[in-house]
Amino acid sequence: MLAWALLYAVLWSLAGVGSQRSSLFNIKGFVYGTVGHPVKIYVKLHQASPVLICMDIDRANKETVDPTYLWTGPNENTLKGNSQINITNTGELVLKDFLEPLSGLYSCMLSYKTIKAETQEETMIKKKYDFLVFAYREPDYSYHMAVRFTTGSCVGRHNDLLFRVLKKILDNLISDLLCHVIEPSYKCHFVKLPERDFLYELFIAFQVNPFAPGWRSLCNRSADCEDITNHNVLKARDRMEEFFRKQAHILHHHFNRTVPAMHFVDHSFQVTRIDNCRPGFGKNEGLHSNCATCCVVCSPGTFSPDVDVTCQICVSVHIYGAKACP
């Protein structure tokens, strides 16, 4: 039996009748430096960075004589190519399979010559470009939902039974997505509507979460597990919306004068997305305005031990992505 039909059968029997992100990307996905202040770059975990160019846009559009490039990493050591670092002979840097420890300040010293046409006098010019590169991941989504049902009274076992049956139906509706209902609660209130007597209504709230038992099996072949869980919980949200939409449809089209005393209140379904960040990551719209919706790796001096969205201060932390304060 369909879930929406099952719920109405229960109601009737109970109550009866009644990527990368940066401020200086160009259309080719390159990021140029800026003299005087660092350019912030955000690289999704396990992905490759954009191409970092050891020049500003103005210099890149001019002839450059005898250029040399020297890249240094977050530890101020000279960078050399390896499995995670690719440096070209034209000064382009790409960071591959990006992880938290790769976050930090990357600097490039560009040296080149200017030559006077009349005298052939050479002058050495040096420019330094800084890039602040941060690992980020998408937040883990869950959804807070609220609905209302009419009831005949705020006392009696029918309200508890409806609450338990509704939770079970909703859990079954989304179980194949490895999502489940958590933190369910309800309160009974009496409501006065214009030109009507008092009504008793159950105000029901719950959260739809993508981490039901067994959810880790989804991540066996994917480094970006939150992409999978977020997709699943979005589908779960859509199923919930459709379920309660059908409740309203049944009420308006399948009942004439007699309706169950306990029934869904039309237009009462409300949904709000909740974002959580994995340990070692957090949100900071002021510091990371170009990646305001991202969970960005916690910088040195901060940490995040849980799924909160804020990196907390800890002066003894000297690494990116700290999950504890020593």
Curated annotation (Swiss-Prot):
<dbReference type="GO" id="GO:0001669">
    <property type="term" value="C:acrosomal vesicle"/>
</dbReference>
<dbReference type="GO" id="GO:0016020">
    <property type="term" value="C:membrane"/>
</dbReference>
<dbReference type="GO" id="GO:0046466">
    <property type="term" value="P:membrane lipid catabolic process"/>
</dbReference>
<keyword id="KW-0964">Secreted</keyword>
<dbReference type="GO" id="GO:0002199">
    <property type="term" value="C:zona pellucida receptor complex"/>
</dbReference>
<dbReference type="Pfam" id="PF07354">
    <property type="entry name" value="Sp38"/>
</dbReference>
<dbReference type="GO" id="GO:0044297">
    <property type="term" value="C:cell body"/>
</dbReference>
<dbReference type="GO" id="GO:0006665">
    <property type="term" value="P:sphingolipid metabolic process"/>
</dbReference>
<protein>
    <recommendedName>
        <fullName>Zona pellucida-binding protein 2</fullName>
    </recommendedName>
</protein>
<dbReference type="InterPro" id="IPR048806">
    <property type="entry name" value="ZPBP1/2_N"/>
</dbReference>
<dbReference type="InterPro" id="IPR048805">
    <property type="entry name" value="ZPBP1/2_C"/>
</dbReference>
<keyword id="KW-0325">Glycoprotein</keyword>
<comment type="similarity">
    <text>Belongs to the zona pellucida-binding protein Sp38 family.</text>
</comment>
<dbReference type="GO" id="GO:0032922">
    <property type="term" value="P:circadian regulation of gene expression"/>
</dbReference>
<dbReference type="GO" id="GO:0001675">
    <property type="term" value="P:acrosome assembly"/>
</dbReference>
<keyword id="KW-0968">Cytoplasmic vesicle</keyword>
<feature type="glycosylation site" description="N-linked (GlcNAc...) asparagine">
    <location>
        <position position="256"/>
    </location>
</feature>
<comment type="function">
    <text>Is implicated in sperm-oocyte interaction during fertilization.</text>
</comment>
<dbReference type="Pfam" id="PF20626">
    <property type="entry name" value="EGF_Sp38_C"/>
</dbReference>
<dbReference type="InterPro" id="IPR010857">
    <property type="entry name" value="Sp38-bd"/>
</dbReference>
<feature type="signal peptide">
    <location>
        <begin position="1"/>
        <end position="19"/>
    </location>
</feature>
<dbReference type="GO" id="GO:0002638">
    <property type="term" value="P:negative regulation of immunoglobulin production"/>
</dbReference>
<dbReference type="GO" id="GO:0007339">
    <property type="term" value="P:binding of sperm to zona pellucida"/>
</dbReference>
<dbReference type="GO" id="GO:0005576">
    <property type="term" value="C:extracellular region"/>
</dbReference>
<feature type="glycosylation site" description="N-linked (GlcNAc...) asparagine">
    <location>
        <position position="86"/>
    </location>
</feature>
<feature type="glycosylation site" description="N-linked (GlcNAc...) asparagine">
    <location>
        <position position="220"/>
    </location>
</feature>
<keyword id="KW-0732">Signal</keyword>
